UniProtKB/Swiss-Prot annotation:
Belongs to the class-III pyridoxal-phosphate-dependent aminotransferase family. HemL subfamily. This is Glutamate-1-semialdehyde 2,1-aminomutase. The modification N6-(pyridoxal phosphate)lysine is found at residue 269. GO terms for biological process: chlorophyll biosynthetic process; protoporphyrinogen IX biosynthetic process.
Amino acid sequence: MLNLKTSAALFERAKKVIPGGVNSPVRAFNSVGGTPVFVTKGEGARMIDVDGNSYIDYVGSWGPFILGHSHPRVIEAIERTMKAHGTSFGAPTELEIELAELIIKVVPSVEMVRMVNSGTEATMSAIRLARGYTKREKIIKFEGCYHGHGDSFLIKAGSGALTLGAPSSPGVTEGTAKDTLNATYNDIESVRALVDSNKGNVAAIIIEAVGGNMGVVPSKKEFLVALRELCDKEGIVLIFDEVMTGFRVALGGAQEVYGITPDLTTMGKIIGGGLPVGAYGGKKEIMEHVSPVGTVYQAGTLSGNPLAMSAGLATIKILAEENPYPELEKKAVIIEEGFKSNLEKLGLNLCQTRVGSMSCLFFTDKEVVDFETANSSDTAKFATYFNSMLESGIYLACSQFEAMFISTMHTEEDLQKTIEANYNALKLAYGK
């Protein structure tokens, strides 16, 4: 039995001063039961908790650590900047320019970019910009797609809403909800119907080209092509939320994988190298509407702070120089094929999805293509599976509706241990 005595004590202490004992709801383990793991160190593909337990980590801080924890070049970049310059100035620095130039170089659709502090901030800002640019009010999002916790996005969102069993959040006003229209993922006719019934008043369509917060749900190529054509025809700003997929599924993100050019892109996670960073960028024609050159206001005390810029620069430089994507693909295939073999041995028919180094094992026999099919998953069986994996030293996202991330630091031994643990966990979950 896993010893989590210190974690349990810390959790009780935390609940007295932090709502639910955590600073992001899913971390409380409510959907899987048991004690949240309190972490003291991360190195490579492993995390160590406060009780000394070591885990092979497939969460990677919810996506940023494509290079693993504490990558030497990233740590060195942060330390160098902190010692030589400081932590933050609230004034421009050359590092901001360098990171912006690098992003523009590797993501061709981005002609200008603005740094913020989180993915939520990036998506909120992109929506405001689209509204200001088009002078329209409505936005279309997709059921199950999660774009952060901004009010406009907490209507039929994925991730936390699915994990906690709530379709939306109290505190979102009726007026805000009316301006957010929900379409069915991978269903272009549902989008056309909304556009037609709100003719001339749809400012933007925002989408995760790979839905990463209802599990991992890839878009169909023909769906994205039709979406691009519809936006062009109707003068709607197409926004790709690449907070999770940016620099993860390819250096140029999901838009590189699919060959689709959005008008605006939101980014986060990997571009901060583990520190809080978000960004939104796209066509110069649109971005020049952002204050101070334009009239669409957006600001931030710590936006573009040098520590985060240094970590992001180091991370993306490594990705651009070393091109680890073929290696990541090989590792992801090993996991995918290993899990598939286990399912066959146990006579189970579950849905596996994957794009690059992010994947999901859904506890349903349905093909998962949208919010409804993702929601058919057996979350009770997932909870049993999750806790068995944790006991085996495999740290997965504590929700059926999150991604499994592979890093450059996962070894062949790590992968084989994970496949073995997967077999035992599935066997337990299904009473085989």
